[in-house]
Amino acid sequence: NIYNKMKYLIKFYTVLIFLTIFSFKSSVADTIKIGLVIPLSGENKELGESVLKSVRLAVNDINDESIVIIPKDNQNDPLQTLEVSKELYSEGIRIIIGPIFKKNTNNLDQLSDDLIFLSFTNKVDESKKNIISSGVNSISQFNAIKKFQTLNKIERSYLFAPDTSILDEIKIGLKKSKIKLKDKFFYDPDPTLITKQIEDVTRYRIRKQNLADEIKRVENSNEINKEKKIAQLEKLDTIGGINFDSVILADFEETLKSVATSLIYTDIPPRRVTYITLNQWFDKSLLNEKMIQPIYFPSVNYDNYQKYLKRYNNYYESKSNQIAFLSYDLTGLVYYLLFKNDFIVDSRIFYEKNSFKG
């Protein structure tokens, strides 16, 4: 009858409404929100927008609707970074990708320790436990160089580093990685002084004089075929061994090239010792310096980087940059760690031993 039909319909729609509400609540509960603190206004707006695009590209590639990115504009200002981070925390967010620049991490230790920042900086700051430096820092690079030393049986590396603001970061990397060095030299990066400093530390003038003395000795000797020996000696630049089998040039751009060129001038070319430097994958001009080849350095997976650039360009019809590339990887890293932890947001996933490498 009509009464029974009405009762049935009321029960049916009540159950349907309940299931819909339950499904909605489950959907909300299952949503994983990740903060993104970047400059979206001001002079660094273009950089911030590129990072945002890269993060959205990563989320699209992950293809999991439970991941939601909440971007906030920090205006590249430390105080604004603190404020927007508080807002994100109040919204229940416990993982934030960003900020980009180290200065914007200055006030973040005022926030709760269960709010984790994956900062783009490569500067290591052990005093701030809730900030993870996600950039390619000196520790990871020296660890990679250690592996390269082992694989290539390099045992006596001489470190050359500039006496500038980056020296503290380099020293942290040396200490934490426990890399073995034959010796180290910190130079003044003034281009007018570099060659003289390299001459001194490599004993160039002594080795040069050794050659002159040897030529003179052979000239005054009664050795057989001394003319041939003299001709061979005159093809050399120096005589005398060096007590290292490799150089680690912890510098960048033109100063790096100046130091490498000075080493070649002092008769220590890359065919004689192995040239190693820090991360240079973004500097294509280094590959054009034929004299200093081969030179080895830690790098991202170059093939994957090229694939990313192509995908970004196809998606947005614009070029990405290195920082945006890092944000793409960070998004994938966060998702991977959450996946391993059954999507339970817990700061410990970033600190447990062997949870991830980077």
Protein language model annotation of sequence segments:
Residues 2, 9, 16-18, 24-358:
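Extracytosolic ligand-binding ectodomains
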